Curated annotation (Swiss-Prot):
It is an enzyme of class 4 (lyase). Pfam families: Lyase_aromatic. GO terms for molecular function: histidine ammonia-lyase activity. It is found in: Cytoplasm. This is Histidine ammonia-lyase.
């Protein structure tokens, strides 16, 4: 059993990748967090005993913030906000996303600025460790005031409401709590608001997009290197001197990855004196384009790392000052920007891949058989596979439109500017799936092209990559039912198996 010890505010991207990908991972709160959590909850109780009026603790919410709530209704207030705000719609989030949402919320609450009792946080930890995942609809948040609807669905289970998946079966929240050995919680003042206010759903979606983008980046670098080999491309564009004088670190690192993958190839030696002057941009400018994508991925990763460790609810409790302050940390604009930048990178990775694949099937450019198959005319080979790539690349261009530039006022104009971060992060999954499909087609095409270069072989690393594909998809000696091969190659692309072939330090969470 693998255990992740959470020291609040110190989660790494590699640990968050584990939360998303490792089903049996167990969480535990580091004991060092207890004092801050307890002090924060005690501050809320003390403020109430002093008769102070504080937003969200003894007032209404949003436009109703000026409504004072009687002491005997404070617990009902917290229960009511969870129930009324659980207004999401659409298919449930995947388990991997819910795990991230829960872990992020645990990490944030445990920093001790939310005024919530330790037993509530520990209940979330117990649900996570028992693999009891709240049913959280994917749609219904605008990323300010936090991810209210998604987090309300998560929180509803804690009070015995809503629904959760237990062993894959959808059950009422009360049943889920019993399955975890817990009683439904009566929320104390501030606790309902602390649970449902925050950016954890948007951040979870964006983190999953980040991890997918990293896997796609590696797969695209491998596929692009294979295409260089299949097309008898030049190594000169990857020379370190070219990239050093431009100075962009992403470009420098990208070129190094290509050099490492392409080193010591028989295919390269076979055409050293071919007289070719320059390759098309889709081969020659890979370090420049993929370097820019790497820069975007790294920048987004840093924003998301900070956000994953942030306190993003409202109001915030500063126990040392005996003070509770209202602000706007719930506004997910940083997450929206990061997700939009990831969308650009994912789209461009796919766009460049589609162009390389189109080059390979064009015998005038690649000097390979037309559409990468013998007996052309009878066989159509990769003709329509390229059309599929073009369709996916075009769809990604629309999906890459920045979500963060949109805003619709909510809550009777009290919340008059929102981030749309939840959609910004959520659409990354569709985009990543599209790009995995594009890369799958290129991978199939490039390996087919390299097989046509026999008896010459590629580098050891690229032969290893080709071997991973050939374990599942054989050479195309004639036309056959194509779709299953694309599916197998896409699964390989998305699996992260190619990550072992590159320097893991290049990408933030590897």
């Amino acid at each position: 059993m693998s255990i992740l010890n959470i020291v609040p505010g110190r989660l790494t991207l590699a640990e968050l990748r584990r939360v998303s990908r490792e089903t049996g991972l167990q969480l535990q709160l580091d004991p060092s967090s207890h004092a801050a959590i307890d002090a924060s909850a005690a501050t809320v109780a003390r403020v109430l005993s002093e008769g102070r009026t504080v937003y969200g603790i003894n007032t209404g919410f949003g436009l109703l913030a000026s409504t004072k709530i009687a002491p005997e209704e404070l617990e009902l207030l917290q229960r009511s906000i969870v129930l009324s705000h659980a207004a999401g719609i659409g298919a449930p989030m995947d388990d991997s996303t819910v795990r991230l949402v829960m872990a992020l919320k645990i990490n944030s609450l445990a920093r001790g600025f939310s005024g919530i009792r330790r037993q509530v946080i520990e209940a979330l930890v117990t649900l996570f460790n028992r693999q009891i995942y709240p049913v959280i609809p994917q749609k219904g948040s605008v990323g300010a005031s936090g991810d209210l609807a998604p987090l309300s669905h998560m929180s509803a289970v804690l009070i015995g409401e809503g629904e959760a998946f237990v062993d894959g079966v959808r059950v009422p929240g009360s049943v889920a709590m019993r399955s975890a050995g817990l009683e439904p919680i009566t929320l104390a003042p501030k606790e309902g608001l602390a649970l449902l206010n925050g950016t954890q759903a948007s951040t979870a979606f964006a983190l999953e997009g980040l991890f997918a983008a990293e896997d796609l980046y590696v797969s695209a670098t491998v596929a692009g290197s294979l295409s260089v080999e299949a097309a008898l491309g030049s190594r000169t564009p990857f020379d370190a001197r070219i990239h050093e004088v431009r100075g962009h670190q992403g470009q420098i690192d990208a070129a190094r990855l290509y050099r490492d993958l392409l080193a010591h190839s028989q295919i390269e030696q076979s055409h050293e004196n071919c007289g070719k002057v320059q390759d098309p941009y889709s081969l020659r400018c890979q370090p420049q384009v993929m370097g820019a994508c790497l820069t975007q991925i790294r920048q987004a990763a840093e924003v998301l790392r900070v956000e994953a460790n942030s306190v993003s609810d409202n109001p915030l409790v500063f126990a040392g000052d005996n003070d509770i302050l209202s602000g706007g940390n719930f506004h997910a604009e940083p997450v929206a920007f990061a997700a939009d930048n990831l969308a650009l990178a994912i789209a461009e990775i796919g766009s460049l891949s589609e162009r390389r694949m189109a080059l390979l099937i064009d015998s005038n450019l690649s000097k390979l058989p037309p559409f990468l198959v013998n007996n052309g005319g009878v066989n159509s080979g990769f003709m329509i596979a390229q059309v599929t790539s073009a369709a996916l690349a075009s769809e990604n261009k629309s999906l890459a439109h920045p979500a963060s530039v949109d805003s619709l006022p909510t809550s009777a104009n009290q919340e008059d500017h929102v981030s749309m971060a939840t959609f910004a992060g959520r659409r990354l999954r569709d985009m990543a799936g599209n790009t995995a499909g594009i890369l799958a087609v290129e991978l199939l095409a490039a390996c087919q092209g390299i097989d046509f270069r026999a008896p010459h072989q590629s580098s050891d690393k690229l032969e290893a990559a080709k071997g991973m594909l050939r374990e599942q998809v054989p050479f195309y000696d004639k036309d056959r039912y194509f779709a299953p091969d694309i599916e197998k190659a896409a699964a390989l692309v998305a699996s992260g198996r190619f990550n072992s072939l590159v320097d893991g330090e290049v990408l933030p969470s590897l």
